């Protein structure tokens, strides 16, 4: 059968609807967003809260967000660049750091709500699958839904590290264990030991030992900062364990200290800003150039 050219008639163009701008730009999955945002129709002022997780090249962003008619409102947020304050100075975008960010945003949100003592979460992490359950005589746990945006839901992805951290931190995040590292598809069981290894940076320590044996030059280039700080593979688990304790002790937000004051920044920027000339200065500049040109001609 010969190929027929598709003709777009006037009826096609008159009925064509352009997608939303953020859909055209490939930024928002509206099919997903509609289901994450739609509130219960029989309840008044009960927004759905989303645990929004996004990754950049050097940072992890975790926010608890609710949708309103005027726009999304961020209830609280946590970032991987805050982790050095808790002792995690390097590897701020790996799976273990993602777990720590999830734990931080959970503890920070519960502290803000005054539920941090009611819902302590999982204090002794063993890698088991656990959901936060409601206490008998008290408020229900704070419920959030994971919002991964356009990221792929690959088994073992870092986004589920943030989910696990938030769940262990005391938030109620509905989920199943089949996307965590250590999930066996055939047996349909979770290897808790493997998941615990990822939470405490065991996979990083394992890679350090492997590189040290096989390729010492590569080890020195990749783990240069670890060598300077005299951190060995045996110390990695302790670093993350201490960080989790520190996060639970004080999850409150503290702004980063600026190197200079606003006045100093302003004075520095003025050094490189070109000043606008007055009319008299421009005329004098032109007259000078004319005089120089005439002098060359003579």
Swiss-Prot record:
InterPro entries: Rbsml_uL18_euk, Ribosomal_uL18_C_euk. Gene3D superfamilies: 3.30.420.100. CDD domains: Ribosomal_L18_L5e. The keyword Isomerase does not apply. One of its GO terms (molecular function) is 5S rRNA binding. Keywords: Cytoplasm, Ribonucleoprotein, Ribosomal protein. Pfam families: Ribosomal_L18_c, Ribosomal_L5e. It is found in: Cytoplasm. The keyword Ribonucleoprotein applies. It comes from the Eukaryota. GO terms for biological process: ribosomal large subunit assembly; translation. Its main location: cytoplasm. GO terms for cellular component: cytosolic large ribosomal subunit. Disulfide bonds: none annotated. Transmembrane segments: none annotated. Component of the ribosome, a large ribonucleoprotein complex responsible for the synthesis of proteins in the cell. The small ribosomal subunit (SSU) binds messenger RNAs (mRNAs) and translates the encoded message by selecting cognate aminoacyl-transfer RNA (tRNA) molecules. The large subunit (LSU) contains the ribosomal catalytic site termed the peptidyl transferase center (PTC), which catalyzes the formation of peptide bonds, thereby polymerizing the amino acids delivered by tRNAs into a polypeptide chain. Component of the large ribosomal subunit. Mature ribosomes consist of a small (40S) and a large (60S) subunit. The 40S subunit contains about 32 different proteins and 1 molecule of RNA (18S). The 60S subunit contains 45 different proteins and 3 molecules of RNA (25S, 5.8S and 5S). Belongs to the universal ribosomal protein uL18 family. PANTHER family: LARGE RIBOSOMAL SUBUNIT PROTEIN UL18, RIBOSOMAL PROTEIN L5-RELATED. This is Large ribosomal subunit protein uL18. It comes from Candida albicans (strain SC5314 / ATCC MYA-2876) (Yeast).
């Amino acid at each position: 059968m010969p190929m027929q050219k598709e003709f777009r008639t006037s009826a096609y163009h008159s009925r064509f609807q352009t997608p939303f701008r953020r859909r055209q730009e490939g930024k928002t999955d509206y099919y997903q967003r509609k289901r994450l945002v739609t509130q219960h129709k029989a309840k008044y002022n009960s927004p759905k809260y989303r645990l929004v997780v996004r990754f950049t090249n050097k940072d992890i962003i975790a926010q608890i967000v609710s949708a309103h008619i005027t726009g999304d409102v961020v209830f609280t947020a946590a970032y991987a660049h805050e982790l050095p304050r808790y002792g995690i100075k390097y590897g701020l975008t790996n799976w273990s750091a993602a777990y720590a960010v999830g734990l931080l945003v959970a503890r920070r949100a519960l502290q803000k709500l005054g539920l941090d003592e009611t819902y302590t979460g999982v204090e002794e992490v063993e890698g088991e699958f656990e959901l936060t359950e409601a206490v008998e005589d008290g408020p229900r746990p704070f419920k959030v839904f994971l919002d991964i945006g356009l990221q792929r839901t690959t088994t073992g992805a870092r986004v589920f590290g943030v989910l696990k951290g938030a769940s262990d931190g005391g938030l109620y995040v509905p989920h199943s264990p089949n996307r965590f590292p250590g999930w066996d598809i055939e047996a349909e069981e979770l290897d808790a030991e493997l998941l615990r290894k990822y939470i405490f940076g065991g996979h990083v320590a394992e890679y350090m030992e492997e590189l040290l044996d096989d390729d010492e030059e590569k080890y020195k280039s990749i783990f240069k900062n670890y060598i300077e700080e005299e951190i060995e593979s045996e110390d990695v688990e302790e670093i993350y364990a201490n960080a989790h304790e520190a996060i639970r002790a004080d999850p409150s937000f503290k702004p980063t200290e600026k190197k200079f004051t606003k006045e100093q920044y302003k004075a520095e920027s003025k050094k490189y800003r070109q000043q606008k000339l007055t009319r008299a200065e421009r005329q004098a500049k032109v007259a000078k150039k004319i005089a120089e040109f005439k002098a060359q001609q003579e």
